[in-house]
Amino acid sequence: AIPETTPLFSLNHQKLEAYLCLKNKVADIMTQEAGIIRTENGLQEGLENLHHLEETEIFEENEYYSLVSKNLLTVAELIIRSALFRKESRGGHFRSDYPTPNDKYVCHIIQQKGKEIRTTPVIRKLKDKN
């Protein structure tokens, strides 16, 4: 006989609507505050808005759409925190309060939720002259 297994996640279809609503709110925050042109004030406001959403949403433990919603908020927060950390403009990251590149930020930014941001140097390979 095949043993019965307990599913890892429940699936509450009523949570789908809540997830889609949250997804739109997060998209609006990221577009307005962490879009193409960024400022420290806007990024801080975006972070506060994300925290407000996280505090007001009701998440069910081990429920699929609740997990996806939490992950969405976590990724958005990590994006904003790394943008706040980089006090420069480079490539697709433009801060109007720091409009020029700064070589201090030629690095890999490493972060985890709830931990300090740290960096590691970028190792550039020398081109072969042959």
How does the language model describe each region?
Residues 1-130:
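Glycine- and aromatic-enriched mobile tails/lids
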